Amino acid sequence: MKLNKLNPRWDAYDRRDSFWLQLLCLKYLGLWPPEDTDQATRNRYIAYGWALRIMFLHLYALTQALYFKDVKDINDIANALFVLMTQVTLIYKLEKFNYNIARIQACLRKLNCTLYHPKQREEFSPVLQSMSGVFWLMIFLMFVAIFTIIMWVMSPAFDNERRLPVPAWFPVDYHHSDIVYGVLFLYQTIGIVMSATYNFSTDTMFSGLMLHINGQIVRLGSMVKKLGHDVPPERQLVATDAEWKEMRKRIDHHSKVYGTMYAKVTECVLFHKDILSFGDEVQDIFQGSIFAQVCASVIIICMTLLQATGDDVTMADLLGCGFYLLVMTSQVFIFCYVGNEISYTTDKFTEFVGFSNYFKFDKRTSQAMIFFLQMTLKDVHIKVGSVLKVTLNLHTFLQIMKLSYSYLAVLQSMESE
């Protein structure tokens, strides 16, 4: 993939390439073990990843937690909690990501399977749109995070007394030593950068895979609409995998026994079943971490707004809170948006069937089509959480924002009293 002025030219047959920026970040952060190497090399890499996380994430979060021993009022709590909640949630998300890394790598390999290759001209558009969506999603979150970091690092310069970018407690006094202050300032800056990179690299893995699933659903819709119509022959694929060969063998058998049209309906049924299975796997891998992010975002957004509305807020603090708020709301909105898109696209299958030339179907093919239609009538919702289920859609996003504002109003009333 050639990158020219942030204008990538995608290869629709290499859909994994849309994650190249995420994989680059995860590789250097110790969260993407080499896939084609011996176990000893993987173990050394895993140890490297643990060392980074302990130094710049776990200890970093511990210094923020210890800050609570000096809090005096609600403003101090908000000042400490809005970043600490992000760190605690991130630690949980990364351990879940690290635990499921083999399954995540398998999902990215599955993304490049022959079944998901576009076969007709109309099928290229949804695949390429999904790839662009994954890339620009990463770019957007990365740039917003960069601006947030810049504001946080600059904000201490606007204060009369010496302070660090993030509220934290250290066993040394940095107020009277330039060297100690410089070392701690650098440590926090590295921690902020790494935490932000961890966040947008792992979160966009889930949303990116879901965008690709949505693109494949749209692809399936175009296949359904062409049933019964005269279409050009499928593009011949030079390289195919074992899964595709086995599926083609089954489809060719149906074509010889029951006819070409019945075989095409069978292909749509098998494709639909595979997409749903892939979606269930992605959902099962990430449901715990996404649920934690959604729940924590209510408190984080509330505390960020409370800090931004304080009396002694500088312009740099206000801009930092604004960009941080944009990052947090964007994370949750993206999760809810991709879930909403998948539900919306799957609900349109009845419409797709209506565009097919079903008048040409024989009795057996019509029965197969009815069976397929019954399969697609089942509602598809992306849900996260184990005991308490949260459906990812735009309604959920609005509820999160309303809940955050309600908590903010309660805290502001307590502060005024």
UniProtKB/Swiss-Prot annotation:
Transmembrane stretches in the record are 3-23, 46-66, 74-94, 134-154, 179-199, 285-305, 318-338
**Tissue expression profile of the protein:** Female-specific antennae and maxillary palp expression.
Please provide the record's keywords in A-Z order: Cell membrane, Glycoprotein, Membrane, Olfaction, Receptor, Sensory transduction, Transducer, Transmembrane, Transmembrane helix
Q: List residues in topological domain: Cytoplasmic.
A: 1-2, 67-73, 155-178, 306-317
Positions annotated as glycosylated: 112
Q: Show the InterPro entries listed in the entry.
A: 7tm6_olfct_rcpt
GO-annotated biological processes:
detection of chemical stimulus involved in sensory perception of smell; olfactory behavior; sensory perception of smell; signal transduction
A GO molecular function term, named singly, is: olfactory receptor activity
Judging by the UniProt lineage, the source's domain of life is Eukaryota
A GO CC annotation given for this chain: plasma membrane
Task: Please list which residues make up the signal peptide.
Answer: none
Record bears the keyword Methyltransferase: no
Bilayer topology term:
Multi-pass membrane protein
Q: Where is it localised?
A: Cell membrane
In this UniProt entry, which residues form the Extracellular topological domain(s)?
24-45, 95-133, 200-284, 339-417
What induces its synthesis?
Strong response to the odorant 4-methylphenol, a component of human sweat, when expressed in odorant receptor deficient Drosophila. In vivo, decreased expression in antennae after a blood meal.
> What family does the database annotate?
Belongs to the insect chemoreceptor superfamily. Heteromeric odorant receptor channel (TC 1.A.69) family. Or2a subfamily.
* Protein function: Odorant receptor which plays a critical role in the anthropophilic host-seeking behavior; establishes the host preference to transmit malaria. May participate in the phenomenon of decreased host-seeking behavior in disease vector mosquitoes after blood feeding.
This chain belongs to which protein, by name?
A: Odorant receptor Or1
Question: From which source organism is this entry?
Answer: Anopheles gambiae (African malaria mosquito)
